[in-house]
């Protein structure tokens, strides 16, 4: 694993001639700990917020293909490693990609930067049912589309009609539900696509029923999840026949702590930053839990939290099955 020094000012100066027509904001050396809900992570070499979809398309057309690109949302399900992220990190702004437009009695056109909870609220006002579960998902639509986010027995795949995206060449794509190849907490699409919006469909409902369903979702989160901590949400995907938290608990990992990172006492499938955790602490804790669960019950936990960026030199976390 080669460590690449982060020098955003140098990269920006080198790219400046091809970026002259870009209207969005490009910032060198952005601290990713200010972006992620874990409040950890190294520097993004360049941090780009496109002005609109045309600006993003142009950016892709002029950016040399060998410059790495990483897409981030609102940072809720994201662990950024301490060595930072080489190349360009792209984050869609809510101003340009956060629209919610009702296009029929049961359909919304929704920007990828829209907060999931705002979509739930819009559906309540429009009396469209089937979106209440987004009230309990601490993320944005782009991440929900990619991860097939769900709660309370409902998944994003059940609401998707079309998804709109751009590729690394700046070409536009429209993907239908079949194209998304959805599975549990996953979609299988071509590498490099960036979601910009989606057409979603619910059902005709009424405010009282929708409000009651949203209240139930909120009450559940409040009761069983450490929502006031610095956390990234569910750490591992549930297994086919058993919840991840159960095998974690049975392996004795509830409350397990490494450095400033801890498996929550309240919900042991949630990692929390106790105050000064590093990305290394969090990822080391996660891999330690995976190893202990495997040793205890032979269950193989898969990460649900997205881990991106590079490790600091001499502070590398190997997947547990490489040191098991």
UniProtKB/Swiss-Prot annotation:
Return the GO cellular component terms, semicolon-separated.
Answer: cytosol
Q: Where is the FAD-binding PCMH-type domain?
A: 39-220
What is this protein called in UniProt?
UDP-N-acetylenolpyruvoylglucosamine reductase
Protein family membership: Belongs to the MurB family.
List the NCBIfam families. murB (TIGR00179), PRK13905.1 (NF010480)
InterPro entries cross-referenced by the UniProt entry: FAD-bd_PCMH, FAD-bd_PCMH-like_sf, FAD-bd_PCMH_sub1, FAD-bd_PCMH_sub2, MurB, MurB_C, MurB_C_sf, Oxid_FAD_bind_N
**Which GO annotations describe the biological process of this protein?**
cell division; cell wall organization; peptidoglycan biosynthetic process; regulation of cell shape
**Cofactor entry:** FAD
